[in-house]
Amino acid sequence: MALDIHAHRILILDFGSQYTQLIARRVREIGVYCELHPFDMDDEAIREFNPRGIILAGGPESVHEANSPRAPQAVFDLNVPVLGICYGMQTMAEQMGGKVEGSDLREFGYARVDVVGKSRLLDGIEDHVDDDGVLGLDVWMSHGDKVTQMPGNFNILASTPSCPIAGMYDDVRGYYGVQFHPEVTHTKQGGRILSRFVQDICGCEALWTASNIVEDAIAQVRAQVGSANVLLGLSGGVDSSVVAALLHRAIGDQLTCVFVDNGLLRLHEGDQVMAMFKENMGVKVIRADAEKQFLDNLAGEADPEKKRKIIGRTFIDVFDAEASKLENIQFLAQGTIYPDVIESAGAKSGKAHVIKSHHNVGGLPEEMNLKLVEPLRELFKDEVRKIGLELGLPYDMVYRHPFPGPGLGVRILGEVKKEYADILRRADHIFIEELRKADWYHKTSQAFVVFQPVKSVGVVGDGRRYAWVVALRAVETVDFMTARWAHLPYELLETVSGRIINEIDGISRVTYDVSSKPPATIEWE
């Protein structure tokens, strides 16, 4: 009988915290399947989900405000362990008969909590032991309200001078609350705390591993598709590449990929995609050379949003044209991943969680009467990368920096022309090459060159040159919501600038973008 890698599962209820997806990722890293659902998930759905344990996440609300979110009653009726984090602890306390009050002294940022009680959750986990034998943890706090009275049968788990009940526990029922955030890296022992809850207290086995996920996905694809043929739009990005590798392993020649070369890709990227999938892996790939069509459609357009729409529409036209030549296609594969499935804006209200529609190939599913195959829809990006490696994709492909869907079309400011794209491709290639040589590529989260349609005077030998300006952009980020410009060494910047100006005819000046996000965005358009 096949292994059920979803059998041991944790339910995470979202009350609107910016950290909620991080909790899910941490639980998955432990090797346990979990799902994220809105706090108002109905009781029947919770029972049907049948979790081994439940985590109540944080949120921006105050429990003593009217209509503030509450955990469903089923959470406390299932007789499974429950961990409340921040707001989750507060609503647990309030709903079970305790008391929560606003605090004059809010705690945001690093804090040290003293471990007070002898609980299963924190037993043997500490960062410090003081002279009196008191155990301490370095944690990350982000709260205004605090629990001032615990429900019956609870004991104090942890304490700070301004928050005497910074944690509470009832070992008999397996109920725990912590006012700090174990899911963020600033809480040094956070991984151990979550592992203790998920594995030791909830009894979950680590079945959620890369090799098991691949086997499970292959079995599901085969069961869904049978002997039918599947179409995939292959971009060369991480998600579509992993889908291609996974489907090829699952169904072989039943998969046909269409790779649209729009003339806005990185240097040699089209050839690399074809070499990897068609030549090395034997995947059926149709390459549609549509550079002229894209550039013709973009001619004269300088508005960034309109450029994006033109590129999107042209992609659909080209993809449709290629797909219509194929026979007996019944399924369309897409690289939808789990964060796409979770409605991001819904985290604020907690009630707007809907499944996004992902017709990233336009109206094709309806027009061609195709059914969708989305083998990555349960996975976070870091999990997609891990299974990419498991499937034999090269590390450099799987851990490549993000590249926007419209490609160089949004890295050329203003109107897109072939001349600009050719110059930018070469400049970007030099920048990335030098980052790799200096061991800076994987220290940055994203790095690229921007073409500016501005000319500047330069001197070459005894002659004057009037040529284009480009900007280097490199950032460091964890989540791409905020980003810091990368503090690259001056010597590296000097090398990159020198090579670009000397090796590329048409560039006279190289600048470096030192804007962080916010206020600037990572991409320029």
From Swiss-Prot:
Complexes and interactors: Homodimer.
Domain of life: Bacteria
Protein function: Catalyzes the synthesis of GMP from XMP.
Annotated ATP binding sites: 235-241
Domain Glutamine amidotransferase type-1 positions: 9-207
GO molecular function, one term: GMP synthase activity
Organism: Pseudomonas putida (strain ATCC 700007 / DSM 6899 / JCM 31910 / BCRC 17059 / LMG 24140 / F1)
Name of the encoding gene: guaA
Keyword match S-adenosyl-L-methionine: no
GO CC terms: cytosol
Catalytic site: 86 (nucleophile), 181, 183
Keywords linked to the UniProt accession: ATP-binding, Glutamine amidotransferase, GMP biosynthesis, Ligase, Nucleotide-binding, Purine biosynthesis
Residue spans crossing the bilayer: none
Catalyzed reactions: XMP + L-glutamine + ATP + H2O = GMP + L-glutamate + AMP + diphosphate + 2 H(+)
Enzyme Commission number(s): 6.3.5.2
Domain GMPS ATP-PPase: 208-400
Alphabetical list of CDD domains matching this protein: GATase1_GMP_Synthase, GMP_synthase_C
Pathway(s) where this gene product acts: Purine metabolism; GMP biosynthesis; GMP from XMP (L-Gln route): step 1/1
Protein name: GMP synthase [glutamine-hydrolyzing]
Pfam families for this protein: GATase, GMP_synt_C, NAD_synthase
